[in-house]
Amino acid sequence: MANDKGSNWDSGLGCSYLLTEAECESDKENEEPGAGVELSVESDRYDSQDEDFVDNASVFQGNHLEVFQALEKKAGEEQILNLKRKVLGSSQNSSGSEASETPVKRRKSGAKRRLFAENEANRVLTPLQVQGEGEGRQELNEEQAISHLHLQLVKSKNATVFKLGLFKSLFLCSFHDITRLFKNDKTTNQQWVLAVFGLAEVFFEASFELLKKQCSFLQMQKRSHEGGTCAVYLICFNTAKSRETVRNLMANTLNVREECLMLQPAKIRGLSAALFWFKSSLSPATLKHGALPEWIRAQTTLNESLQTEKFDFGTMVQWAYDHKYAEESKIAYEYALAAGSDSNARAFLATNSQAKHVKDCATMVRHYLRAETQALSMPAYIKARCKLATGEGSWKSILTFFNYQNIELITFINALKLWLKGIPKKNCLAFIGPPNTGKSMLCNSLIHFLGGSVLSFANHKSHFWLASLADTRAALVDDATHACWRYFDTYLRNALDGYPVSIDRKHKAAVQIKAPPLLVTSNIDVQAEDRYLYLHSRVQTFRFEQPCTDESGEQPFNITDADWKSFFVRLWGRLDLIDEEEDSEEDGDSMRTFTCSARNTNAVD
């Protein structure tokens, strides 16, 4: 065959083919280097075709690793170049490598910029353009300044100090001079001061329209110089917001990072802060929405600024007496709230002795109220309490409750008439019965209407647990046990009678008063206990046997102050209060207005 390959050997020679086909080391040494490589490669290729299971041919990888490293290096250089353009905004980088790499793309982008120069969206989306003449150069400079400011904020060791310094250099005023300090981001406030650094002009103008819907007053101004740009906002929201909420709102609205914001509540007490905002509002570069807040007008108006506010303690006492505030915490809180409309309250907040004034005011009000209460007769006092009750009520709810307990209302009215007069041996009413029969509900509603006090037997080991009897017209001891009744039988027989008793008061001398009418609720029937024999004549009992809770555990009866008001008005004559009421009206005591402040009505200036 013409294409027959391989060696020709004679089969009669036996194993002599081994000598013919074998490779010798001496042959390789005599061969040329290039020829040896070619022969070995060719031999390996031929051998690999005949391999059956194990491939011992040599493998050549080529330069794949070098190509991979070259591609990685090129991709890394492109990423670094893009990062420099985004962070630094360098015109040299954008006009250097990028212009040399894609000149056609640059020319197209520049042509698009010239065709659509009036479109604001293109200016925002493509801020980095080749510097040209006019508007394009100015826009590029602004973007470069913003990027440079962001870079300074990132590189600065103390970003807060850098922002405070930039704010003071632009507005010639410290940021802390116009703001207060809130340490908790959850504290809510309506008036906030915001400083934004590196804000683009398009977002500054758009934020004015977006924030007007959420604010009752909005004032904003933006300034810039070679160090960067800063915009300051005074925002009075319609509802109180926390710093965290305002920060998220403004960061999304202005499209800036939270690191570029400084946010604190407005300083409403300070002439310098008010003048700063008032002067800024007069500038034509300031955008303003709504009327100036009251705290700015009050401190910048000529009359208010020249007027010297002096605190008058008597005016404060008169205010607390008119509102019936006798607790120190209530007086302090409510009078601080009145500072917006009361000049004396503002002067009170400016004093350094607020705690002393509040304590003295509460003491004086308690003295006045106690003397006023003791000066009134029981009919006049009940009439005054009826004026304080609001709403519409019906005396029939009380009638229905007594009928439900199988008690005649006329019996309760006769006992109540003697109880209100404080007649001896009729000065204590006890409501006896099993639990959940409405005893405490009835007595607590009556004591609340009369403005009485509640005594807790848990404090009986204290010498002063009866001190509140000196300042009240009626008292209640709820859920009296055997220990309480034994205490009454041992120490308070004259108090149950309604005779004068001596009351020990803390840090004061003991006072002698007539024991006020007393209500007692208990599960123990005193009349059936022989051990309380001496209390039988001193206590008038009413037994409640019917439970006052339905299947769901709720109480169907609810007696309010308006119901007691209707009850007393309806049964005023039957309670024998007419004569004393007419006498008080003729004397004019009930119509007299009490004045505890030094009002100089006839003074001559």
From Swiss-Prot:
List residues binding ATP.
433-440
- Annotated EC: 5.6.2.4
Give every SF3 helicase domain span.
407-557
**Is the keyword Ubl conjugation assigned to this protein?**
yes
Q: Which residues carry this modification: Phosphothreonine?
A: 102
Q: Can you state which reaction this protein catalyses?
A: Couples ATP hydrolysis with the unwinding of duplex DNA by translocating in the 3'-5' direction; ATP + H2O = ADP + phosphate + H(+)
Molecular function terms, GO-annotated: ATP binding; ATP hydrolysis activity; DNA binding; DNA helicase activity
Q: What is the effect of changing residue 109 to A?
A: About 50% increase in replication of viral DNA
Which GO terms are recorded in the biological process aspect for this UniProt protein? DNA replication
Q: Where is the composition biased (Polar residues)?
A: 592-605
Q: Which InterPro entries match?
A: Helicase_SF3_DNA-vir (IPR014015), P-loop_NTPase (IPR027417), PPV_DNA_helicase_E1_C (IPR001177), PPV_DNA_helicase_E1_N (IPR014000), PPV_E1_DBD (IPR046832), PPV_E1_DBD_sf (IPR046935), Rep_E1_papillomaV (IPR016393), Znf_lg_T-Ag_D1_dom_sf (IPR037102)
Cross-link named Glycyl lysine isopeptide (Lys-Gly) (interchain with G-Cter in SUMO), sites:
514
According to the record, the residues making up region (Disordered) are 90-112, 582-605
GO cellular component, as recorded: host cell nucleus
Region annotation (DNA-binding region) maps to 142-308
What is its EC class?
isomerase
User: Where is the short sequence motif Nuclear localization signal located?
Assistant: 84-86, 105-108
Q: How is it modified after translation?
A: Phosphorylated. Probably phosphorylated by host PKA and PKC at Ser-109. Phosphorylated by host CDK1 at Thr-102.
Q: List the subcellular locations.
A: Host nucleus
SUBUNIT field: Can form hexamers. Interacts with E2 protein; this interaction increases E1 DNA binding specificity. Interacts with host DNA polymerase subunit POLA2. Interacts with host single stranded DNA-binding protein RPA1. Interacts with host TOP1; this interaction stimulates the enzymatic activity of TOP1.
The record's similarity note reads: Belongs to the papillomaviridae E1 protein family.
Q: What does this protein do?
A: ATP-dependent DNA 3'-5' helicase required for initiation of viral DNA replication. It forms a complex with the viral E2 protein. The E1-E2 complex binds to the replication origin which contains binding sites for both proteins. During the initial step, a dimer of E1 interacts with a dimer of protein E2 leading to a complex that binds the viral origin of replication with high specificity. Then, a second dimer of E1 displaces the E2 dimer in an ATP-dependent manner to form the E1 tetramer.
| Name of this chain's protein | Replication protein E1
Instruction: Record the organism.
Output: Bovine papillomavirus type 1
What are the top taxonomic ranks of the organism? Answer: Viruses, Monodnaviria, Shotokuvirae, Cossaviricota, Papovaviricetes
